[in-house]
């Protein structure tokens, strides 16, 4: 009795103690440069835009326009590329005066500004006297196209304005040209890219046939361009060192197209290069009109959601978030990534954006299309291990235990594909969350059988002993190297707890009996608390072994903590203890850079496990943001804000892509920075 009274007295004091601890915790690393590399801030905020402070990268900021795989590559320096997917060509601007010429990437002064969806440059150089050129680049809103507007200001009459385009091979790159996976050089105008390029010069424009097919001996793709009035010529891809060299060279078998602009009183010039099909390649392109529409779309999207805080480094988030979220939408579903991994995988975090951004129609379309992808038969199947994968996976064949009734295939509106992830778990969580935002009884009645079949499928495959604890089979972002061999896993059990809890509420809305879902939810929560909670450590175990001594894994990843909190498994005291575990046991990596006006920024890796391997010990943006959310949910808003701020500032301002959402951070121990708008 005395012990119980003491516990009741000490518990709230301990909660306050934990909540008051600085987020630096005991795991903060010594203030040294990461990998002995000093950093300088890359971009800084200016209103809703990002202005270059220090950098000389090319092709590090993608512009999206049409909700397809097409994008325009821009960067710190004003050299551009089209990606279709596949290399669609490289575009350069140049200037000259008398015998001297250069590409503008070599200009004396370049001011670079990224406003979500649009890149702007101001070019100053000794060749231009006291004048300058202003460039604005967009991706077309209605077609797969590159749009460039150039405005001149006080440019001497003797200055020449030149342009060059070429190198459209149609070749896809390893990871579609993404940061950290493919080198910048894949977008350079490499002479070999120009092989089999066939140009047809027209008045103020051209068409280009490219993407050679050796079997049919024909080109498979077409670009159509409208360019400013002026001289138009073909040159050699071997002679592109500067505009003067290009003009003096002899045409060979690796052609490029170049021109010199007839500078006019209008002092404004447009380029429009579109990826077209045979029946659209002869249409008249209205460059100014296309530019206006693209600018309107980019601006509308960037202003869909606005932040107004005392920190200008966070006020840009609304525009970048909406732009990146729009980039992963390709009707009828959200994709895995905007650049790399631009493919259908139904359960990564992207679809959660839809309701937050007011795209309830997109959310509904996404969920419907994957509801159509649910396997309906057989009712169940045998467990068949894949011998080609060292028996680590189930054989990817429909009709086996995993790929039976209730399984949801990776492609929308197709239920005939087996794949090695349990994408059901997170997808259903997103679907259930949709109904927290939307009172949609008609859709609920339509989709509820999908939820029912999913819950039965999860139970049948991952809680085979009916103890309320579920195995994890490649079910979350970090799952690639996580293996539990049929064990009882905290985070998947937490997902199933929330799923059954919300299914009970939705069943009641439909007039169905919710009791079975309530009973399963209670069983799961009790099992997690009784078998997976570690009272001495104040955290949940990662999992419990299924065999042998049924040992507990007592060093959980941060996903175990934040998923348990997000799914409302722990009580208030347990939340604080579990968050304290992250402070105490997970390393904290200082974020340092010259010119960064923030102090005490730091990130966390996903685990303290060794040795490093992919997906097990990463410094990942989304994982840090999910942990920040858990800190807010767990009653430590100051720490949550600090981690939230740290992750976003590091990604959007220190990272390679201005306003970009990386997958992995510069601080990842082995891979370093990886991907953008992921």
Give the residues covered by each predicted segment.
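Terminal accessory carbohydrate-recognition/targeting modules of carbohydrate-active enzymes
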Residues: 24-316, 345-346, 356-362, 636, ...
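Amphipathic, well-ordered alpha-helical segments in soluble domains
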Residues: 89-93, 117-119, 366, 423-430, ...
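Catalytic cores of carbohydrate-active enzymes
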Residues: 315, 380-384, 463-478, 485-491, ...
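Substrate-binding groove/exosite segments of carbohydrate-active enzymes
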Residues: 180, 245-252, 258, 296-445, ...
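Active-site cavity-forming subdomains of large catalytic enzyme subunits
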Residues: 431, 454-458
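Bacterial Sec-dependent N-terminal signal peptides
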Residues: 1-29, 150
